[in-house]
């Protein structure tokens, strides 16, 4: 089964729905089973703190939401949070957060960190350190060279001010 075919649609095609409401009716002396469709509507304010005011409840329409259109519906809804949290990074003041979500992936800790400037810098540093660790794995003497560069401020400054290699230039 490909990624475009969901398992929920497979179940819907191959198995009867779980909720079946049926009752026996007597029509003109004959008993007949009648099935009632089960339709459920949920009303919820999922936008959090919307940037623009929402329509009145009476003016809102029901939307069909399924696995295929969930991210599009979420993006159209523009769920948003805005609040202040204590700044535990520097220990001074509060951080003002204002985050708008567009897909389910935006709720992951890394995606939230990318939307907060001070956390994004830490996340980038963590990613670069993880890349460095992967690069150094199995290279003899690499750890000693890194420790030597960290302990020698003059060497560290020279390495930081050295021109970076250009990856854009075509090689002959």
Swiss-Prot record:
Coiled-coil residue spans: none
Protein name: Type VI secretion system sheath protein TssB1
Gene null: resulting phenotype: Deletion mutant shows a clear reduction in E. coli killing.
Taxonomic path: Bacteria, Pseudomonadati, Pseudomonadota, Gammaproteobacteria, Pseudomonadales
Recorded name of the encoding gene: tssB1
Record note on quaternary structure: Forms a heterodimer with TssC1. Heterodimers assemble to form the sheath of the T6SS machinery. Interacts with TagJ. Interacts with TssA1.
One Pfam entry name: T6SS_VipA
InterPro entries, per database record: T6SS_TssB1
Task of the protein: Core component of the H1 type VI (H1-T6SS) secretion system that plays a role in the release of toxins targeting both eukaryotic and prokaryotic species. Forms the sheath of the structure by assembling into tubules together with TssC1 resulting in the stacking of cogwheel-like structures showing predominantly a 12-fold symmetry. The sheath contracts to provide the energy needed for effector delivery.
């Amino acid at each position: 089964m490909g990624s475009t075919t969901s398992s929920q649609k497979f179940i819907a095609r191959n198995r009867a729905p779980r909720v079946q409401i049926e009752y026996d009716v007597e029509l003109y002396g004959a008993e007949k089973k009648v099935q009632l469709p089960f339709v459920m509507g949920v009303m919820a304010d999922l936008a959090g703190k919307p940037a623009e005011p929402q329509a009145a409840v009476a003016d809102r329409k029901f939307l069909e939401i399924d696995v295929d259109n969930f991210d599009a519906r979420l993006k159209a809804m523009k769920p948003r949070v805005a609040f202040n949290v204590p700044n535990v990074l520097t220990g001074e003041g509060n951080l003002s957060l204002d985050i708008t979500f567009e897909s389910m992936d935006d709720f992951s800790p890394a995606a939230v960190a990318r939307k907060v400037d001070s956390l994004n810098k830490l996340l980038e540093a963590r990613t670069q350190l993880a890349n460095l660790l992967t690069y150094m794995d199995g290279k003899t003497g690499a750890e000693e060279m890194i420790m030597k560069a960290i302990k020698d401020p003059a060497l560290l400054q020279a390495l930081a001010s050295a021109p970076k290699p250009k990856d854009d230039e075509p090689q002959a």
